[in-house]
């Protein structure tokens, strides 16, 4: 019985590691211009060119396993990905810059993160904020980070805080984005009491930190 319990706990831990989502404002260690959906094996280069020096090659298999070939070490998923969903087969890295068909991406590490250019012709795809919320957000919905203040949950009539408020988000069943303007997203909210609300939500602060994310899990 004890062995079965230990095996069950290991299984739960293994399964949990296969889903990495940010739930707090500081869960994402890098502020970027969007996200890049990446494919394995992922080759990261110093320059946006096929001739650029290879900085790292990342392998992952959507089963809680990821390894770096250059450093020859197994990596923690939450130290690499901004979001990683085994069930949706989605792996996202923070994007810092773009150049034609290349994206500069960065691992989600605090100290000495690995950053490099990845080729979009190899199946990787960059999403700016508008595309990220309009494509993924409309499909899966959004969720708010757990450590938001009440002021962060207020809905406005326009995409600025100087406009009138239209309500606030309490316990949402679903948040659906419709339009992105700067750091604001127009959302339709189905709240806990089935009350429908519409308004502009400030999804990113002036420092570039996100307050909401796509509900992949």
Annotate each language-model stretch with its function:
Residues 137-186, 190-196, 201:
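Intrinsically disordered, low-complexity segments enriched in Gly and acidic/Ser/Thr residues
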Residues 13-16, 178:
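Long, low-complexity, intrinsically disordered N-terminal extensions of eukaryotic proteins, enriched
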Residues 4-14:
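Sec-dependent N-terminal signal peptides
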Residues 19-146, 188-217:
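Boundary regions of SH3-family modules and the immediately adjacent low-complexity/disordered segments
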């Amino acid at each position: 019985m004890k062995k079965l319990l230990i095996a069950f706990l290991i299984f739960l831990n293994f399964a949990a590691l296969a889903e990495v989502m940010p739930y707090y404002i500081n869960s994402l260690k890098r502020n970027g211009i969007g996200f890049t959906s990446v494919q394995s094996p992922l080759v990261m280069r110093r320059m946006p060119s096929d001739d650029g020096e290879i900085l790292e090659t990342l392998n992952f298999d959507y089963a809680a396993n990821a390894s770096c070939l250059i450093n020859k070490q197994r990596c923690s998923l939450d130290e690499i990905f901004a979001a990683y969903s085994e069930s949706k087969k989605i792996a996202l890295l923070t994007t810092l810059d773009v150049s034609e068909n290349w994206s500069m991406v960065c691992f989600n590490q605090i100290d000495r993160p690995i950053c490099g250019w990845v080729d979009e012709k190899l199946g990787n795809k960059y999403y700016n904020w508008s595309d990220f919320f309009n494509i993924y957000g409309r499909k899966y919905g959004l969720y708010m980070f757990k450590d938001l203040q009440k002021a962060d949950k207020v809905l406005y009539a326009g995409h600025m805080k100087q406009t009138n408020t239209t309500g606030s988000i309490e316990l949402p069943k679903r948040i659906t984005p419709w339009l992105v303007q700067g750091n604001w997203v127009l959302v339709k909210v189905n709240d806990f009491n089935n009350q429908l609300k519409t308004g502009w939500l400030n999804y990113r602060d002036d420092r570039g930190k996100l307050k909401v994310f796509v509900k992949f899990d």
